[in-house]
C-alpha cells in the first residue's frame, strides 16, 4: 500500500466516523450528554436541576454550564418575583455588512434565546430588599456586547439609581461584538461610566 492509498483510507475512516455521530437534534432530545470531566456520559437531569444549578456534580470538576438569564433570575429572586425591564432598541447592523451577515446572526440568536440582545435586565425583590440586576447570555452570539447590549446595561444602571437599589451583574461570555467594530467599543466606555454612577 503506497502513501496515497493510506491517506485516502484514513480520510474514508474519518468520514465514516463522522456519519456515525449523533446529529445536534438527537443530542438535544437525548437524556444523556458527554461528561465535562472525561468520564462516562451523564444524565442531563443530574446537572440541570435546582440543586446543582447547571454545575457538574463531580467534586473534582465543578464545571459551570451556561445559566440562561431568566433561569438565573428565577433562582435569585424566586419564580415570578421579578419583572423584566424594557431596554432601548437600536437599529440592527449599523455598519451595513454585505449579504446581511450580521442581521442573519442576530435573527438566529434572537430565535435561540428569545432575547433582543445578549443582556437581560430585571428588577425584583430578594429577602425584602429591592434589587436591580442584569445578566449576559452566552448563547446570544457568545455573550458579545453590542451597542444595544451596552444600552441595556446603562438602562440597568439608570433603574438602580432611580429606585435606589443595589445593582448585581452576572457576566457570562462577553467582549465587544466584532460586527459593530468601534461603535461597540464606545459602549464599553459608556457602561463603565454608568456602573461608576451607581
Predicted regions and their residues:
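Terminal-region recognition feature
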Residues: 1-198
Amino acid at each position: 500500500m503506497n502513501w496515497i492509498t493510506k491517506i485516502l483510507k484514513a480520510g474514508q475512516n474519518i468520514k465514516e466516523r463522522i456519519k456515525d455521530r449523533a446529529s445536534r437534534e438527537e443530542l438535544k432530545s437525548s437524556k444523556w450528554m458527554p461528561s465535562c470531566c472525561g468520564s462516562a456520559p451523564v444524565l442531563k437531569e443530574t446537572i440541570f436541576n435546582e440543586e446543582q444549578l447547571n454545575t457538574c456534580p463531580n467534586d473534582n470538576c465543578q464545571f459551570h454550564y451556561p445559566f440562561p438569564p431568566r433561569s438565573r433570575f428565577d433562582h435569585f429572586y424566586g419564580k415570578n418575583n421579578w419583572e423584566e425591564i424594557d431596554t432601548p432598541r437600536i437599529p440592527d447592523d449599523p455598519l451595513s455588512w454585505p449579504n446581511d451577515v450580521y442581521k442573519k446572526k442576530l435573527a438566529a440568536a434572537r430565535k435561540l434565546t428569545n432575547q433582543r440582545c445578549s443582556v437581560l435586565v430585571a428588577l425584583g425583590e430578594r429577602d425584602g430588599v429591592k434589587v436591580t440586576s442584569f445578566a449576559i447570555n452566552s448563547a446570544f452570539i457568545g455573550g458579545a456586547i453590542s451597542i444595544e447590549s451596552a444600552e441595556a446595561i446603562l438602562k440597568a444602571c439608570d433603574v438602580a439609581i432611580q429606585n435606589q437599589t443595589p445593582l448585581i451583574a452576572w457576566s457570562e461570555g462577553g467582549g465587544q461584538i466584532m460586527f459593530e467594530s468601534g461603535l461597540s467599543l464606545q459602549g464599553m466606555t459608556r457602561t463603565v461610566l454608568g456602573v461608576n454612577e451607581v
